[in-house]
Every structure is written in C-alpha cells, then in structure tokens.
Regions:
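Catalytic Walker B motif of ABC-type/P-loop ATPase nucleotide-binding domains
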Residues: 165-169
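H-loop/switch region of ABC-family ATPase nucleotide-binding domains
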Residues: 200-203
Length: 214
C-alpha cells in the first residue's frame, strides 16, 4: 500500500473566516512532487494552511505519515518558505534585508553566522555542494543576490531535514537566468529520496518538469 504523507478528507476549517468554498479532500503520496496552481485570491495559501494544520478542522480528518522521519508532527516535518519580494526573501531574510542597509553593513550578519551549527554533517556537505554555499559563507546576507538568497534560504531550511518542503512563488522577482538556475537546483532537490516538494504557483508556465501532480 502506497504511503500517504498528507491525507485530508472533507476538511473544513473551524474558523468560518478562513474557509474554502468546498470541503478539502486531497492526498499527497510518497514520491510525488506537487504544484498547487491558481490566481491570486484563489485560496492557495489557505489550502496550504489547512494541509499544515495551522487551522484546526471543524469537519473532516487530517492524517500525516512522515516515515521514515523519527517524529510525526507537522512542525518537524513540513517546512514552508514564502518568497514575497524582488529580493526573493521570505520572513527571516526579509527582516535582515530591511534591518541593515548601505549605512550599517558592518553590523549585518554573515551567511555562516545565520546557518549556525549543523548536527548532521553528511546532510550539510550534501546541501553545501548542491547549492554551492562555500563561496557565500563569508558574505553578508544583505549583499546576496536574489539567486544567492534563494539558495541560502533553501539550505537553511533543508538543514532541518524536513519531509515535505512547501515553496510559495519561488520564481517571483527572478530574471530569466536566475529562474533557470533555480529550476535546475529544484530538479536536483526532487531527486532526494526522503524529500517531497510542493510548489505554490500563480502561473502554469512556472511548473517545472519534475512536478508529478497538479
């Protein structure tokens, strides 16, 4: 029997202000890489919030199976990155970009400081090689290019060894060359045996070739 990493059946949020028009029934099967595609305001973010357990359900069931992970909590196994601005940064990186500017770059943290200590040395080596992080370690985060910021944040997130990685609009604000680079990086990520990738996209043209389910 195939493993269902995320299974929601007839899901309706308890909070009436954050309900979709219809109950949600959806299965994420192990080995699938999924794209959730829709226009702005279509409810993509709310769907992700339901799948990750952010909103308790009034009706329906939500079941996780994150094997071979040592824990079965959504907090440990599902990581979400929202790329919101032209720098390609999400919550944490956006904070750093706004906090430090050209007048106080000396106080801005280095990439190596923000990545911190790593418990799994094998995973660290694999990710550093995949994203070519070594040349970036001595750089200040505020000075990273949009492509470098994407790679930094993916590395920082993946060092937590999630089972499911959800990325919201990962291609927003990128030029053509950087988009192609990110396509290549994500395709390599999709080959990691224990990682399931979910992309939240606004346009069908952004769907990479490794996506197996829409």
């Amino acid at each position: 029997m195939q493993q269902h990493t995320i299974h929601i059946a007839g899901g309706v949020a308890r909070n009436p202000l954050v309900r979709l028009s219809n109950p949600v029934t959806l299965d994420f099967l192990d080995g699938e890489h999924i794209a959730i595609v829709g226009s702005n305001g279509a409810g993509k973010s709310l769907l992700v919030d339901l799948l990750t357990g952010k909103y308790p359900l009034r009706d329906g069931t939500l079941v996780y199976d994150f094997r071979p992970s040592a824990t079965q909590t959504a907090y440990d196994n599902i990581k979400y990155i929202a790329f919101r601005d032209t720098y390609g940064s999400a919550d944490a990186n956006y904070y750093y970009q706004q906090r430090w500017n050209a007048h106080d770059q000396e106080d801005a943290p280095l990439v190596c400081d923000l990545l911190g200590e790593v418990k799994d040395e094998s995973l660290r080596q694999q990710l550093f090689e995949l994203f070519r992080i070594e040349p970036m370690l001595g750089k200040k985060v505020i000075l990273l290019s949009s492509g470098e910021l994407r790679k930094f944040q993916l590395t920082k997130t993946l060092l937590t060894d999630p089972r499911v990685l959800i990325m919201d609009n990962p291609f927003i604000g990128l030029d053509a060359a950087t988009r192609e680079l990110l396509y290549t990086v994500l395709e390599k990520l999709a080959q990691l045996a224990s990682l399931q990738i979910v992309l939240v996209l606004s346009m069908l043209d952004d769907i990479p070739s490794f996506i197996t389910l829409l």
